[in-house]
UniProtKB/Swiss-Prot annotation:
It holds the Pfam family PDCD10_N. Belongs to the PDCD10 family. GO terms for cellular component: cytosol; FAR/SIN/STRIPAK complex; Golgi membrane; plasma membrane. One of its GO terms (biological process) is positive regulation of cell population proliferation. Promotes cell proliferation. Modulates apoptotic pathways. Increases mitogen-activated protein kinase activity and STK26 activity. Important for cell migration, and for normal structure and assembly of the Golgi complex. Part of the striatin-interacting phosphatase and kinase (STRIPAK) complexes. STRIPAK complexes have critical roles in protein (de)phosphorylation and are regulators of multiple signaling pathways including Hippo, MAPK, nuclear receptor and cytoskeleton remodeling. GO terms for molecular function: protein homodimerization activity. There is a cross-link at K186 (Glycyl lysine isopeptide (Lys-Gly) (interchain with G-Cter in SUMO2)). InterPro entries: PDC10_dimerisation_sf (IPR046409), PDCD10 (IPR009652), PDCD10_N (IPR048288). The keyword Cytoplasm applies. This is Programmed cell death protein 10. The modification N6-acetyllysine is found at K179.
Amino acid sequence: MRMTMEEMKNEAETTSMVSMPLYAVMYPVFNELERVNLSAAQTLRAAFIKAEKENPGLTQDIIMKILEKKSVEVNFTESLLRMAADDVEEYMIERPEPEFQDLNEKARALKQILSKIPDEINDRVRFLQTIKDIASAIKELLDTVNNVFKKYQYQNRRALEHQKKEFVKYSKSFSDTLKTYFKDGKAINVFISANRLIHQTNLILQTFKTVA
């Protein structure tokens, strides 16, 4: 049975999403290890990247097994959200023009606000302010994306437009999740949706970095 284009896109999105723990959890570990043993850290990083590429979700499985073995009870989705604000070198745009650096900055700002959700969600007043801040950060990021579109011409504009549409789709999904949360109080769904939005934010940077 052949998959439709939409199903293929959804599968690709799910596959890359399960790899989120590689850069959110393991990259900071590799960075710390580099200070002690640069060669070992680089070898380990390369091995994890290769293994994750061939078996998406492997890093998450390894982390979960370690936590299970140590009998550590942790909400992995919440913890992932808390850690996902850090810059990931592989996604950062290196072009020096102000518009591109502004794109890095706006993406960073959105991720940092989203990562604070677990700390704010139980305080209704603070959480409502956080939601407003997220909405503003989303708008600012999209405005910056549009500014780059206006100023620079791309051969692969279709890929950029597609990624922008995906980001908008997940932004709306996040908004819908918030509305549901205020009815059912299930914070875990907000954390999942926020992680997806952070992932889409990283993919915007990655797409611009690839074609720019």
